[in-house]
Regions:
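A structural signal for multi-pass alpha-helical bundles of membrane permease subunits
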Residues: 1-168
Length: 168
């Protein structure tokens, strides 16, 4: 647990070059998965899932064993349905982080047609003057997809955050 928390103190800029090499080895350069996967596998995600799993009642697992479920069956039929809020919360937070990131997508994406909105807004900045009306309108377009995803999964997100934060 200490090592997971300690890795949260390492700045992402230090991890970028090894992650870049890993994405090249996995042939994930210039793909959306190459942008999103590092956020899904971060230390904060692991720590959140650990805290969420500690709060699961052991009686449910024992009841599954008594009913004749294998360990795989317990995982699929009991644990996964209970952890939907945690998965939804982490998916929303990871997607928001990937969507709003500037430097990592600039490294992963090579084609201009795959650039994310922050990269596109960055290309509008010029040393000769900026059109702030266009930048602010573009920023609003950056908020809309995340807002729609949040509104669709709001119940799961709030359940996941509350359950993972409070042990009882």
């Amino acid at each position: 647990l200490f090592l997971v928390i300690a890795t949260m103190m390492v700045p992402f800029e230090i991890l970028m070059l090894p992650l870049y090499q890993e994405m090249m080895d996995l042939n994930l350069m210039n793909t959306t998965a190459g942008v999103i996967l590092p956020g899904l596998c971060g230390a904060s995600t692991i720590f959140f899932f650990r805290q969420y799993m500690i709060g699961l009642p052991k009686d449910l697992l024992d009841a599954g064993r008594i009913d004749g479920c294998t360990e795989y069956g317990i995982c699929v039929k009991i644990i996964l349905p209970i952890t939907k809020p945690a998965f939804a919360s982490m998916a929303i937070l990871s997607t928001m982080g990937s969507w709003n990131n500037l430097l990592w997508p600039m490294m992963v994406y090579r084609d201009a047609d795959k650039f994310t909105l922050p990269i596109g807004l960055n290309t509008l900045l010029t040393p000769y003057g900026n059109n702030y009306d266009v930048l602010i309108a573009g920023s609003m377009f950056g908020i809309i997809p995340i807002l729609v995803v949040f509104l669709c999964f709001q119940r799961y997100f709030i359940d996941g955050m509350v359950t993972g934060a409070v042990k009882g």
